[in-house]
Amino acid sequence: DNGIKTHTESLKESINYFTNNLEIDTVNPSSDSNIFEKVKDLDKYDGLIWGGSSLNIYSDTIEIRKQIDFMRECQKRVKNILAICWGLQVAVTAAGGEVKQGTNGAHRGIAHEIIINSEGLKHLLYKDKKQIFNTPAFNYDEVVTLPAGSTLLSSNKVNKVMGLNFKSELSDIWGIQ
């Protein structure tokens, strides 16, 4: 143990802060060769959290296509998805939206002055959150086309889409960049 936690370990620790009464399975759709065997019964899950990555969706590698395919399957069978950063980009792409390299710069460490819009102020994702806030972030890409029926929740000068809610198949997807 070198003392550095993976993104997955940090997410688990954060969730366990609120409750340890959860059964959490971890998969990597890019490298798990039997991904659908490992999670045969996606229907049993109450939710899914899809975290960050340094990949770019438009690179269109086999590893990225595997993730998009797996997300499509999750959207058919998992009711609640929290899509964080890369997870948002995969969820949007799987649902017919589009992600491209950002044209207004990048977030390198902190995303500044995220503004929650009127729809976001009503959404549980931002319950009790200040209307303008900063948050840790590393991203070079942005959602440029929203999936059908999406509700934009927040934006900043770098990314128009910082918070998003949409439904795809069975899933209610809450996404944050």
Question: What residue ranges belong to the model's regions?
Answer:
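Active-site phosphate/pyrophosphate- and oxyanion-stabilizing loops and adjacent acidic/basic residues
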Residues: 9-13, 89, 140
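Alpha-helix N-cap/helix-start motif
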Residues: 4, 60, 84, 145-146
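Short glycine-/acidic-enriched loop or helix-start segments at secondary-structure transitions
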Residues: 36, 59-61, 92-94, 147, ...
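Short alpha-helical
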Residues: 2, 6, 89, 159-160
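Pocket-forming structural segment of enzyme catalytic cores
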Residues: 97-177
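N-terminal beta1-alpha1 cap of cysteine-dependent amidohydrolase-like domains
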Residues: 1-79
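A structural signal for short, well-ordered beta-strand segments and their strand-loop junctions
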Residues: 26, 82-84, 175
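Cysteine-nucleophile active-site neighborhood
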Residues: 53-120, 134
